[in-house]
């Protein structure tokens, strides 16, 4: 999602794409390490296409995957109505952007060998909000076994269980907070 000119959001949920960068020459007998890039942008803006990893992939003999995922309210929106209408915990969470990232990691595990990558040597890395998302993946049981190393560049994280999130949602003053210390 990108912010439009007058405070409006433009975009689409049709954003679940990824890019795979490989060295120009790949040896069929050697599986390469995989780097899984999560862009920054406050989880409200940004896209995988902003980054060209082709030179990095060739220079260091890596397979690099950059992903798109739902952003803004399409990516992270908890509402009590989700709990009432959803049959599974994942949908109840409202963490759709994180679930998109996990889906992309599952795709990597199933398909990266076809691109010369080693599905047993995957490093997730991201900067800013992407770094925050790295921490979210580290703490998610749904991502267990989908990657092996992690690099967070300037990201931080906080987590809330569903009960805490619903209390935070119901607190009308929560929108007035200016510091993460105020949440604690």
Residue ranges and their predicted role:
Residues 5-183:
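Serine-hydrolase-like catalytic core of hydrolytic proteins
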């Amino acid at each position: 999602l990108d912010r439009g000119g007058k405070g409006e959001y433009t975009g689409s949920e049709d954003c679940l794409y990824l890019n795979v960068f490989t060295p120009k020459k790949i040896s069929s007998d050697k599986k390469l390490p995989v780097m899984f890039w999560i862009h920054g942008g406050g989880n409200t803006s940004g896209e995988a296409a902003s980054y060209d990893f082709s030179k990095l992939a060739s220079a260091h003999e890596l397979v690099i995957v950059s992903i798109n995922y739902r952003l803004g309210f399409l990516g992270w929106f908890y509402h009590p109505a989700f709990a009432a209408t959803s049959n599974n915990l994942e949908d109840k969470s409202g963490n759709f952007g994180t679930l998109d990232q996990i889906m992309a990691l599952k795709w990597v595990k199933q398909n990266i060998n076809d691109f010369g990558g080693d599905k047993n040597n995957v490093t997730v890395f991201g900067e800013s909000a992407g770094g925050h998302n790295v921490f979210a993946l580290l703490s998610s049981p749904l991502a267990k076994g989908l990657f092996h190393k992690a690099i967070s560049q300037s990201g931080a994280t906080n987590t809330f269980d569903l009960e805490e999130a619903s209390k935070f949602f119901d607190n009308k003053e929560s929108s007035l907070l200016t510091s993460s210390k105020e949440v604690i």
